Amino acid sequence: MKPVKQDAVKLLDIFDPEMASLLHREEKRQFETIGLIASENVASPLSTCLEGSVFTNKNTEGYPGKRFVGGCELADQAELLALERVKKVFGAEHANIQSGNATIANCAVLTGLLERGDTFLGLTLDNGGHLSHGAKFHYSGREFNALHYGVNRETERIDMDQVRQMALEHHPKLIVTGASSYPRMIDYAGFRSICDEVGAYFWVDCCLLYTSP
C-alpha cells in the first residue's frame, strides 16, 4: 500500500496551502507541548491511518449483517474484529463501537437505562466530572434528575461516604463514575458495593481516564 497519508499531505500543500499551514502548525504545537487534557491523548498513527482510509467512504448504516446498503462485507468484518477485541480487552459479553464520540455514547446509555425524570448520581462538574453526567445546561441534566457527589477537600478523592449517603437518601436508578479532570484512581469496588446496596445500575464512564486493562 502506498503511503497515502504522506501523499495526501503533499497534495494539500499544493492545492490548499492555507489549510496545509494550519495542519503543520497544529502538528508542531502538539509535539512540542505536554498536554494534560484527558480527552486529548495522542492517537496512535495506526488509528489515524484507519480513520483516514477508504473505509471513510463507505456508508455502513446499521449493524454487521443488517446494513441498509450493499457492499459492506469488508466493513462488517472490520467492525466485528474491533468488537471482539474490545470484548476481550474488557472481559465483556457485549460491546458497541459505533458512537461518533463519548458524549453521544453517554447520552445513549442514559436514554437506554433511564426514563425521563429518573434520578441518577454523578461527579459534580466543578470537582472534575463530565458535563454529560448531569450538567444543568446539558441534555443529561435537563431530561433526568441528576444529583452530584463531590471530592473530599482533605483527601482530594471522591467522597465515598457522601456517595453512599446520597444513594441511601435518593435511591437513584443509576450511579455513574468517571471524570474529565479527576486524576485519581477511582474506587470501582466501592461504587459497585453502593450500587448493589440500593439496587442501582453501575455505569463506569472510562473514556477519558482508565487504568490499562
Describe each model-derived feature in a short phrase:
Residues 2-66:
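N-terminal "arm"/small-domain region of PLP-dependent enzymes with the aminotransferase-like
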Residues 59-104:
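Conserved N-terminal alpha-helix of the aminotransferase class I/II PLP-enzyme fold
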Residues 95-99, 122-123, 176-177, 202-206:
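General beta-strand structural signal in soluble alpha/beta enzymes
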Residues 114-129:
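Conserved PLP-anchoring active-site segment centered on the Schiff-base-forming lysine
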Residues 132-177:
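PLP-dependent aminotransferase-class I/II
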Residues 176-199:
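Active-site core of PLP-dependent enzymes with the aminotransferase class I/II
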Residues 210-213:
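Conserved small/polar residues in nucleotide/adenosyl-binding loops
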